[in-house]
């Protein structure tokens, strides 16, 4: 009985230690360019649904010549699986590769996720109020 209690205690301690090391990427992220908010606004929201399952949503905007009032946008929304520090988003022909660090997302390989000149590519920083 003592051996079982010790084994269960060790399992609980190792589980708690693992949980403390796995980062939580949930939050609101905004795209930055040269340490400033990007003039072509883009944001991504991650909501944790399970241990490695997130709901991902976001919007990216491209503003053309102000005299012509051209504005194009793209939207993303779906359930994604975190694999290591990467999310591969693929919904309705829109694909993204997202690499996650503690407070940043790096989006690349944007394909088909918005109107003309719209892209989600770039570096996103988690806003402090969403941590």
Task: Give residue spans per PLM region.
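Edge beta-strand at a domain terminus
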Residues: 69-86, 110-131
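Acidic, glycine-rich flexible loop segments
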Residues: 86-102
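Generic beta-strand structural signal
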Residues: 48-49, 82, 100-101, 126
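N-terminal signal peptide c-region/cleavage motif recognized by signal peptidases
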Residues: 14-16
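Positively charged n-region of N-terminal signal peptides that target proteins for export
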Residues: 1-4
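Tryptophan-anchored aromatic micro-motifs
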Residues: 21-42, 120-128
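Short, hydrophobic/aromatic-rich segments at coil-to-beta transitions
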Residues: 22-32, 52-55, 81-89, 106
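N-terminal glycine/threonine-rich, aromatic-flanked beta-hairpin/loop signature
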Residues: 38-79, 109
């Amino acid at each position: 009985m003592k051996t079982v209690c010790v084994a269960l205690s060790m399992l609980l301690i190792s589980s708690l230690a693992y949980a403390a090391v796995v980062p939580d990427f949930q939050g609101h992220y905004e795209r930055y360019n040269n340490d400033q908010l990007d003039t072509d606004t883009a944001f991504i929201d991650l909501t944790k649904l399970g241990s490695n399952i997130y709901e991902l949503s976001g919007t990216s905007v491209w503003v053309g010549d102000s005299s012509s009032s051209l504005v194009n946008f793209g939207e993303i929304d779906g359930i994604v699986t975190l694999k290591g520090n990467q999310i591969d988003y693929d919904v309705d022909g829109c694909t993204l590769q997202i690499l996650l660090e503690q407070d940043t997302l790096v989006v690349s390989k944007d394909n088909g996720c918005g109107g003309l000149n719209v892209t989600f590519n770039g570096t996103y920083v988690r806003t402090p109020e969403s941590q």
